[in-house]
Amino acid sequence: MADIPENAPQHCPGTGSTEAGKSSACQGCPNQSICASAATSAPDPAIEEIKEKMSLVKHKILVLSGKGGVGKSTFSAHLAHGLAQDEGKEVALLDVDICGPSIPRMMGLEGEQVHQSGSGWSPVYVEDNLAVMSVGFLLSSPDDAVIWRGPKKNGMIKQFLRDVDWGEVDYLIVDTPPGTSDEHLSVVQYLSAAGIDGAVIVTTPQEVSLQDVRKEINFCRKVKLPIIGVVENMSGFICPKCENESQIFPPTTGGAEKMCTDLNVSLLGKVPLDPNIGKSCDTGKSFFTEIPDSPATLSYRIIIQRIQDYCEKKK
């Protein structure tokens, strides 16, 4: 991401962006004509630095959602836990939801802090093979609000990707904010040179969520971000007593399955509602070890295996 002029509007795409001087945010900016002429455009040196840092990371997976509250961060946390159950795999979880960092609590790491070493920022470890980094570790209190404009968020993401000392990692999972914002553009721009395996998009069955997922899919295609597949979360409730399934959020337009068929995207699986998932997130424990035989756990295992198979085929 290139520099942002001091007198730039709030949603300035950056002087080195392909949208510089052309996006709707540039209207009325005193720098518009200069940026549009490409006179300020220059490669961001951080891109090469990040590429070198990421050369130690085999697979990079972005977790996206069109709408907040569909369980994206919950999925990211459990994807990390599930991959890390293989003790031979090194797993890293990066939280770039700058204004709503929930990963520290979900991973049982609230109150932890980041330490500086000679080789960069040291991530916080949940297990010997599971490392986490989040802006939540930089706040004095979990209740502190992060009130930053786009350029400052982009700078934080750049620092995470360039300066965190992950070491050699098999899987880097990047938990992003909902929607398509500056954070998504920054991550894609910085990681493209290093190679992103793809994105997993999380949704719920109802149309109000699916309509935003369609936009997310279009975003991925426009920025040439491969789509690993879609996960339908909160997909029915299986009674633990009678094992009958009820549709708490009815898929009025066919749910994620029909959407994936229409848009030629893979459906990785459906995760049923389970109150214990929310409980495990609140207590910072792994759902896989707490309720290993629940229908939700079994669904997660199938989805995680499909993600691994996709990544291995891309090697």
Curated annotation (Swiss-Prot):
One of its GO terms (biological process) is iron-sulfur cluster assembly. [4Fe-4S] cluster 1 binds at residues 12, 26, 29, 35. It comes from the Eukaryota. InterPro entries: Mrp-like_CS (IPR000808), Mrp/NBP35_ATP-bd (IPR019591), NUBP1/Nbp35 (IPR028601), P-loop_NTPase (IPR027417), YlxH/NBP35 (IPR033756). Keywords: 4Fe-4S, ATP-binding, Cytoplasm, Iron, Iron-sulfur, Metal-binding, Nucleotide-binding. Pfam families: ParA. ATP binds at residues 66-73. GO terms for molecular function: 4 iron, 4 sulfur cluster binding; ATP binding; ATP-dependent FeS chaperone activity; iron-sulfur cluster binding; metal ion binding. PROSITE patterns: MRP. The keyword 4Fe-4S applies. One of its GO terms (cellular component) is cytosol. It is found in: Cytoplasm. Binds 4 [4Fe-4S] clusters per heterotetramer. Contains two stable clusters in the N-termini of nubp1 and two labile, bridging clusters between subunits of the nubp1-nubp2 heterotetramer. Heterotetramer of 2 nubp1 and 2 nubp2 chains. This is Cytosolic Fe-S cluster assembly factor nubp1-B. It comes from Xenopus laevis. The gene is nubp1-B.
